[in-house]
């Protein structure tokens, strides 16, 4: 026997199994709370208790003097809970914290306002544990080691969790100001059902070094407000169904401006190899140990080889129905990693003088054949040693302007429109640069396609991020397309298991992703790439 009854807005399925009757509801979760003296006394979801500890706790606070010296602030304060307003106020020697608790349907919202009462010192960072959670079942996503944390630097700060009978999302409601939220560890490993909720700015020494610094200082005699929500759902709830409003808020604040309709494949060209110690061919041109660029005859041979490579590449591109090609190393590869790719077309004539009188003709061959051209640029500045035998890529104060200057040069001289942005990371934590940099560069060159090596969600609003098939990436993440439906990526197929991922790549191409392939010679893999586009 099987029947379905409609009760209000929920759907209750009554399933008969022998003499046992099971009720399964798809109605939204219902959150209820009870006030405590130092926070919450209870947090229930459909009458199931989820609160392990409801006391609000300040774990760390770091203040900075005008001279730059930092010191820890006091974490001991005097608490007062306003039962009517459901607001906790805690007074500290350096200021105050006010925490509001609000419930609506399946959501608990915490509003944390930090007041800096100091006349001179800035609050550099804070770390709060507003409460601790107790799940009915083991949290599936926690592996016992990696924190379940998210930040909103260039992305939404949303952590999706599942625990057997249900799911939950932790979200930072503000999509513009940086914040990190989530569950850093379990209290009861390996059971993994009890976790502190963490909200912080600046850095936490016990967290992985790869996490970004959350720069959100609170100036003297001012305040700041963090708004964090816990959203509860059924076991089959998706991140989009629980936090779609946060995604919508994100795209409203950071709308997509990318307009690139050509999704045909793009060819990759590498003219050189990394340093091999060849004194007569120090930049590794054509992986040829016998090439001697120090003589007039060697220069002539270099020119002939380069233009022949261009012609051969064009033949491959026609066969592949490519839209264009990116030359990664027009300056050669004289220096070791991580300076292998110079990424500065402005200095090609001086760093690779043998290229000076042939580079223009090289790129012209592609343009005259009807193909787009491209180069690699970096947001750092190359600094040569005094003897010019070594070099480093140095960060600059204004990477936006540096990228604009490099691209403008290559665009004016060679007509490039395909721009690979190499090593676009912060100096300290090696996370992707602020996406506003890519936004400004994209606005300066609306007819160019930017392809950044590293990316966050917001990068997709202005560019096509780079991925490699050999690392198991076959397409733009669905979570990204939930936010930016027209988002697409550039996926480098070389040395990747094309047969294994063929169906995934077919689906990716249908959705608009672009495949990058080797075009400076007829790579046997190219026919497999070509076949993907002929589905």
Predicted regions and their residues:
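Positively charged n-region of N-terminal signal peptides that target proteins for export
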Residues: 1-4
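Bacterial Sec-dependent signal peptides at the C-terminal "C-region" and cleavage site
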Residues: 7-27
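Carbohydrate-recognition beta-sandwich/jelly-roll modules
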Residues: 23-335, 349, 532
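Conserved, mostly hydrophobic/aromatic
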Residues: 112, 221, 366, 422, ...
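Aromatic-lined carbohydrate-binding/catalytic grooves of carbohydrate-active enzymes
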Residues: 268-428
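Alpha-helix-loop-beta-strand connector modules within alpha/beta enzyme cores
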Residues: 362-366, 437-449
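Glycan-recognition surfaces
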Residues: 383-405, 432, 444-535
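Active-site-adjacent beta->alpha loops and helix N-cap segments on the catalytic face
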Residues: 430-438
């Amino acid at each position: 026997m099987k029947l379905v009854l409609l009760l209000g807005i929920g759907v209750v399925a009554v399933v008969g199994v022998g003499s046992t009757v099971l009720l399964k509801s798809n109605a939204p979760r219902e959150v209820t709370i009870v006030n405590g003296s130092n926070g919450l006394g209870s947090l229930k979801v459909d009458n199931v208790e989820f609160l392990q500890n409801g006391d609000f706790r300040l774990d760390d606070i770091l203040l900075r003097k005008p001279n730059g010296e930092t010191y820890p602030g006091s974490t001991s304060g005097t608490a007062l809970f306003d039962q009517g307003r459901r607001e906790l106020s805690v007074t500290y020697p350096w200021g105050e914290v006010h925490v509001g608790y609000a419930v609506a349907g399946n959501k608990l919202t915490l509003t944390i306002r930090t007041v800096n009462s100091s006349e001179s010192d800035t609050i550099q960072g804070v770390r709060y544990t507003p409460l601790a959670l107790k799940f009915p079942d083991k949290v599936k996503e926690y592996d016992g080691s990696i924190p379940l944390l998210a930040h909103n630097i260039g992305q939404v700060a949303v952590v999706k969790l599942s625990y057997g009978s249900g799911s939950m999302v932790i979200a930072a409601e503000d999509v513009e100001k940086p914040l990190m939220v989530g569950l850093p560890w379990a209290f009861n490993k390996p059971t993994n059902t009890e976790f502190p909720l963490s909200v912080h700015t600046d850095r936490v020494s016990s967290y992985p070094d790869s996490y970004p610094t959350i720069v959100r200082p609170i100036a003297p005699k001012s305040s700041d407000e963090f708004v964090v929500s816990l959203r509860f759902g059924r076991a089959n709830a998706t991140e989009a169904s629980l936090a779609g409003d946060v995604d919508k808020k994100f795209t409203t604040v950071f709308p997509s401006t990318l307009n690139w309709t050509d999704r045909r494949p793009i060819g990759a060209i590498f003219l050189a190899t990394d340093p091999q110690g060849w004194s007569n061919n120090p930049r590794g041109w054509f992986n040829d140990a016998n090439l001697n660029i120090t003589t007039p005859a060697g220069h002539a041979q270099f020119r002939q080889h380069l233009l022949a490579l261009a012609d051969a590449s064009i033949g491959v591109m026609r066969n592949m129905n490519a839209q264009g090609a990116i030359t990664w190393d027009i300056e050669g590869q004289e220096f070791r990693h991580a300076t292998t790719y110079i990424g500065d077309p402005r200095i090609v004539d001086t760093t690779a003088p043998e290229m000076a009188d042939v580079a223009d003709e090289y790129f012209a061959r592609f343009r005259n054949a009807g193909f787009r051209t491209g180069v690699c640029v970096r947001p750092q500045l190359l600094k040569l040693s005094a003897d010019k035998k070594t070099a480093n890529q140095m960060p600059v104060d204004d990477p936006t302007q540096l990228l604009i200057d490099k691209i403008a040069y290559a665009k004016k001289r060679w007509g490039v429109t395909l721009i690979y942005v190499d090593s676009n990371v912060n100096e300290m934590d090696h996370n992707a640069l602020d996406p506003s940099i890519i936004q400004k560069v994209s606005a300066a060159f609306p007819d160019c396609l930017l392809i950044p090596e590293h990316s966050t969600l917001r990068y997709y609003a202005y560019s096509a991020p780079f991925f490699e098939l050999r690392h198991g990436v076959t397409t733009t993440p669905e979570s990204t397309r939930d936010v930016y439906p027209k988002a697409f990526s550039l996926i480098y197929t070389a040395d990747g298991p094309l047969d294994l991922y063929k169906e995934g790549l077919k689906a990716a191409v249908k959705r608009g992703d672009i495949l990058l392939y080797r075009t400076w010679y007829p790579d046997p893999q190219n026919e497999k790439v070509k076949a993907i586009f002929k589905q």
